[in-house]
C-alpha cells in the first residue's frame, strides 16, 4: 500500500508591497523604516512593462471600493525564484495578472495591512475567485482580514490569538471566507474592522490579566 505524500506548503511566487509616492506625507512613514526588511542580495533593477511575468503568479483578490479610483502605485517586488532579481520601487502602474488588482491609496482603511504584513508573515492557501477546489498561494496577504487587518487594533488581536495557539487552527477556515467578504463589499470590510477591533480589545484585556496573575 503506497504511502500518501504530505502536501507541500505553498510558497508565494513573489512578495509584493505597495508603497506611496515618496513625496507624499503619510502618518505611516515611520513604520516603513521599521518594518521594511533589508533588500535581498542581488542586482537591483527597475520594474518595466516587460516584467509582468513576475506579477502573473501572484494572485491578488481585488477590493472594489467605489470611493476610490485605481491610482498609479509604487511597487516593491521581491521574486523568490532563483535567477530573478529584486525590484526597486517605481511609478509603473501595477496590474497583477492574478485574481485582480488591489486598489488602495494612503487614505484607505487598508493601510494597516502594511503593519500586519511584516509582523505576521503567514503563508497559507486561499481559494481563488470562483470557489475553485484548488487553493492558490496567498502571495501578498492583502486580500484577507486575517492576514491584513483593516484597523491598527487588529494586529494586537492577531498577536493575542497567536499567543493562545489558536491562529493555526482557525486561519485556514476563516481566511477564504473573509477574503470573499472583503472582495465584494467595502461596507463588509468596515463591519469586519469594527468586529475585529472589539475582539482585540477584549482579548488584550484577557491577556493582560493572565500575565499579571
Swiss-Prot record:
Q: Does the keyword Cell membrane apply?
A: no
Q: What are the annotated disulfide bridges? A: none
Domain of life from the UniProt record: Viruses
Extract one GO BP annotation from the record: symbiont-mediated suppression of host innate immune response
- Which UniProt keywords are present, listed alphabetically? Host mitochondrion, Host-virus interaction, Inhibition of host innate immune response by virus, Viral immunoevasion
Location, primary (coarse class): host cell
Induction entry: expressed as early as 9 hpi.
Which cellular component appears as one GO term in the record? host cell mitochondrion
Q: What does this protein do?
A: Plays a role in antagonizing the host innate immune response.
Further information: This ORF is not present in other Noroviruses.
Question: What is the designated name of this protein?
Answer: Virulence factor 1
Amino acid at each position: 500500500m503506497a504511502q500518501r505524500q504530505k502536501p507541500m506548503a505553498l510558497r508565494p511566487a513573489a512578495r509584493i508591497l505597495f508603497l506611496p509616492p515618496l513625496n507624499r506625507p503619510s502618518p505611516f512613514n515611520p513604520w516603513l523604516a521599521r518594518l521594511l526588511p533589508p533588500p535581498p542580495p542581488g542586482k537591483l533593477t527597475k520594474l518595466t512593462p516587460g516584467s509582468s511575468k513576475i506579477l502573473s503568479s501572484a494572485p491578488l483578490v481585488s477590493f472594489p471600493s467605489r470611493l476610490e479610483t485605481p491610482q498609479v502605485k509604487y511597487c516593491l517586488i521581491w521574486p523568490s525564484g532563483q535567477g530573478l532579481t529584486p525590484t526597486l520601487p517605481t511609478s509603473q502602474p501595477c496590474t497583477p495578472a492574478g485574481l485582480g488588482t488591489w486598489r488602495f491609496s494612503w487614505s484607505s482603511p487598508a493601510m494597516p495591512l502594511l503593519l500586519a504584513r511584516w509582523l505576521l508573515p503567514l503563508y497559507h492557501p486561499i481559494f481563488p475567485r470562483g470557489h475553485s477546489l484548488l487553493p492558490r498561494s496567498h502571495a501578498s496577504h492583502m486580500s484577507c482580514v486575517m492576514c491584513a487587518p483593516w484597523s491598527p487594533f487588529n494586529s494586537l488581536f492577531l498577536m493575542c490569538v497567536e499567543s493562545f495557539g489558536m491562529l493555526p487552527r482557525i486561519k485556514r477556515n476563516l481566511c477564504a471566507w473573509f477574503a470573499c467578504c472583503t472582495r465584494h463589499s467595502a461596507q463588509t470590510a468596515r463591519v469586519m474592522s469594527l468586529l475585529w477591533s472589539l475582539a482585540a480589545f477584549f482579548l488584550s484585556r484577557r491577556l493582560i490579566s493572565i500575565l499579571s496573575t
